[in-house]
Amino acid sequence: MTNRISRLKTALFANTRQISLERALLYTASHRQTEGEPVIMRRAKATAYILEHVEISIRDEELIAGNRTVKPRAGIMSPEMDPYWLLKELDQFPTRPQDRFAISEEDKRIYREELFPYWEKRSMKDFINGQMTDEVKAATSTQIFSINQTDKGQGHIIIDYPRLLNHGLGELVAQMQQHCQQQPENHFYQAALLLLEASQKHILRYAELAETMAASCTDGPRREELLTIAEISRHNAEHKPQTFWQACQLFWYMNIILQYESNASSLSLGRFDQYMLPFYQASLTQGEDPAFLKELLESLWVKCNDIVLLRSTSSARYFAGFPTGYTALLGGLTENGRSAVNVLSFLCLDAYQSVQLPQPNLGVRTNALIDTPFLMKTAETIRLGTGIPQIFNDEVVVPAFLNRGVSLEDARDYSVVGCVELSIPGRTYGLHDIAMFNLLKVMEICLHENEGNAALTYEGLLEQIRAKISHYITLMVEGSNICDIGHRDWAPVPLLSSFISDCLEKGRDITDGGARYNFSGVQGIGIANLSDSLHALKGMIFDQQRLSFDELLSVLKANFTTPEGEKVRARLINRFEKYGNDIDEVDNISAELLRHYCKEVEKYQNPRGGYFTPGSYTVSAHVPLGSVVGATPDGRFAGEQLADGGLSPMLGQDAQGPTAVLKSVSKLDNTLLSNGTLLNVKFTPATLEGEAGLRKLADFLRAFTQLKLQHIQFNVVNADTLREAQQRPQDYAGLVVRVAGYSAFFVELSKEIQDDIIRRTAHQL
């Protein structure tokens, strides 16, 4: 890492995060002027107004220009989506348990007196709440399932970066002008053209700023850098990039512009090493210093950490630690099925090893063709302990997409949005994080409904759980589709849609079914606790008959505080096998019930003509979802978290080592989980030391690939180090750990999430 990159990192985190009202005020100012116009035009004009008037800056020593806010890591508001939680939490932002922000008293006054009164009763949230039935509201209030993305843009998408970079904005504007001439009544084309032209003007604002700064700059080398930024910006406003610097700059400008449009999480980066390779090679051919090109890439990686998302307190519990979702996958397959690893794949990992920040959320695609040098580079990066890169298995993911009707060529081109959500870059609008389903809560409901049922059998209980899962999936689909329609009718994204295949041919926004692939992704959470509970209940009640069902239910209701409660809990934990130890009897329960969940989910369609797709990952939702579930037959206390990750074993229950964990997860039908899965594994640093340690990790990754698991990620850290960081956070400000599908600064996490990471089993190889 160069001195410049070190200083850029330090400057990014030097000050307290603040909330900026600028986007909200500009958006609102435009919206007041467009009453009566089509929603998509109002949205486009508001975004264009932001691009024209928002304050811009180029910070000291930056090589890549473009900042969403002048102050680093500031949160922005989108009251047009949901003004109510913002009003409720204005005074809580600086002191809340997770993801704190400072906000001035004057900004609070402006929000209360100017912004909120305008958006009250005219936001997307008002529409969604008005459409939700009482039954759906009841289910969400008890957290049987949650409906997400009701308060901001959907995001969770990858634009067609090759189209942007290989054609350039000038050519794209010309194409959109033709569409407008052919169909002048089509508001989507008009809105997209307006925003493409506004994007050009916004980029030219940076060119002018760089020239102004250069004119007064007394540092010769910095003056030349500013003039180069100006030249690149003027070129990018009209022409396709020719060099790596130009490509990185246009790539970042578009990321910032799309943030203004929707204020969404997980506008992810796709297969960065594939579409950026021609520009990297062109710069090398032109004689650029490879060390400078690496510094450019490191600059871009640092920039990815400047965008943080302002979430509600409850949402921050589900998505703790600013998982912005700048996710990129490296390696994988070409469209012809050959290995896609290239020199830029290695450089992306090298640059990350220098920077070691939570974003970008890099991942590596493994397959039978992956070569040893790249696998070892991957293992070397994992060993650093930041949880990056995560690993995805082509041998599972490609068939999973084929099973959903995706073409083979497109399936081989898959990438990931957000945390682990599987998507086809530039061709999918997948609503990948639309809902989370609490499987353990459903079991709890069934247990209580059978109180006093002397005729209850284990098979009868299983059948009731299946039926109840099916019932609540129906309600989850209903709520998800209302949210889907809300985004269509209230929050179209015409600029983003112009970079998604088939939207231009159809003349429709992604929210209106314009994309080639239209999924709705919903996560089943708690499968480890569910199978552990049912296996223990079957053994204790129906096989060994040590307690009656009602006696066990009484112990659970009392949270194991009855005279025999602790003894019962110890037996439930220690005498019955647990998922994650390669024991068929309990693993098969997981496989059967998760398959039932998947097959039920995939029955349903969304308003865009696509189908629902199941996944199993938690982000950090295993903590709040566990807080609403009472004591369970796996020995879990009332309110205790669920198993982390999605497919990970419950904390402390994976006693047979990491290979046994792999074998347990391999018994699940990973191909059905086409919205993504998540498996956390924690290693002690000592087990990966030296060349031998790297080889062991590489062999473990090959076993993961051969066993046909879909995903795995790692923490490599001692629990003692984490405990010290809790006690002396000022000494561990740069400590990055893996949460669930993303990495975060350990000291920025709430204590409940910190404790969760500390308690995870640390394995040895």
Language-model segments: residues:
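Extended amphipathic alpha-helical scaffold segments
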Residues: 203-211, 273-277
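A conserved hydrophobic secondary-structure block that centers on an alpha-helix together
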Residues: 214-217, 221
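Conserved catalytic cores of very large enzyme subunits
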Residues: 2-189, 221, 225-765
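Extended non-globular scaffold/tether segments
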Residues: 190-201
